[in-house]
Amino acid sequence: MKLTCVLIITVLFLTASQLITADYSRDQRQYRAVRLGDEMRNFKGARDCGGQGKGCYTQPCCPGLRCRGGGTGGGVCQP
């Protein structure tokens, strides 16, 4: 009888602690996703692109342009 009561109390305690922990971690993930989205939006590589005639050795070309050339100095963004 005592063992049964101890087991029931233990199960209730573990269930309650898991519910509390799950509720806390769910909120943390939500904030983490928002923070990661902000970091992706402000990432320097995501913002900068080379316009027509600009070098594409250190940064990618803007949409609609391709990196042409090469050699020792790198390529140039051209349509």
Curated annotation (Swiss-Prot):
Domain of life per record: Eukaryota
Task: Could you list this entry's UniProt keywords, alphabetically sorted.
Answer: Disulfide bond, Knottin, Secreted, Signal, Toxin
- Which InterPro entries has this protein been placed in? Conotoxin
Q: List the GO terms this entry assigns under cellular component, sorted alphabetically.
A: extracellular region
Q: Which GO terms describe its molecular function?
A: ion channel inhibitor activity; toxin activity
Signal peptide boundaries: 1-22
Q: What is its main location?
A: secreted
Q: Does the keyword Transport apply?
A: no
User: Which cysteines share a disulfide bond?
Assistant: 49-62, 56-67, 61-77
**Places the protein is found:** Secreted
Pro-sequence residue ranges: 23-47
Q: Where does tissue-level expression of this protein occur?
A: Expressed by the venom duct.
Q: What is known of its domains?
A: The presence of a 'disulfide through disulfide knot' structurally defines this protein as a knottin. The cysteine framework is VI/VII (C-C-CC-C-C).
Name the family the entry cites: Belongs to the conotoxin O1 superfamily.
Q: What is this protein called?
A: Conotoxin 12
